[in-house]
């Protein structure tokens, strides 16, 4: 996704209170599931909305964004083994070319007892 598209997503977020309310509910649910074992990494931070609700999280995206902390490829997480307490993946898994590579990378960087918290859209 390009920076221009992500900027448009941020603008939509600012205009749509109902969208904010829905996601803020889920952000609270996600945060409640995080364990206190170390840093929390958000994969696919995009518009930066989760970062606003969880400022201490390390926010990242494949696209370089000035409002996020890191630019990275989710398939190749640039962290030491067993260095993270949580990884949050919100509406991202379906965008990954090799989701199993990501799962393996997440398993490597999470501490024992750490959590991979994922939420995916479902349209049926």
Q: Residue spans of the language-model regions?
A:
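Conserved N-terminal segment of class I S-adenosyl-L-methionine
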Residues: 1-76, 103
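Short conserved AdoMet
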Residues: 35, 97, 111
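Surface-exposed loop/turn positions
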Residues: 38, 81-83, 114
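A short acidic, Gly/Pro-enriched loop at the edge of an enzyme's catalytic core
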Residues: 75-87
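Active-site micro-motifs of SAM-dependent methyltransferase domains
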Residues: 76, 94, 123
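A short beta-strand submotif of the Rossmann-like class I SAM-dependent methyltransferase core
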Residues: 86-92, 118
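A short glycine-rich, Lys/Arg-flanked "PGG" loop and its adjoining helix->strand segment in the class I
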Residues: 100-115
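Conserved class I S-adenosyl-L-methionine
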Residues: 117-124
């Amino acid at each position: 996704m390009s920076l221009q598209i992500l900027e448009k997503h941020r603008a939509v977020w600012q205009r749509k209170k109902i969208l904010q309310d829905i996601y803020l509910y889920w952000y609270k649910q996600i945060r409640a599931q995080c364990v206190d074992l170390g840093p929390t990494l958000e994969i696919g931070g995009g518009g930066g909305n989760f970062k606003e609700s969880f400022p201490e999280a390390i926010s990242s995206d494949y696209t370089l964004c000035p409002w996020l902390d890191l630019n990275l490829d989710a398939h190749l997480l640039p962290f030491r083994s067993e260095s993270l307490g949580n990884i949050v993946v919100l509406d991202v898994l379906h965008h990954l070319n090799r989701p199993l590579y990501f799962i393996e990378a997440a398993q490597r960087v999470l501490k024992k007892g750490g959590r991979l918290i994922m939420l995916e859209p479902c349209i049926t």
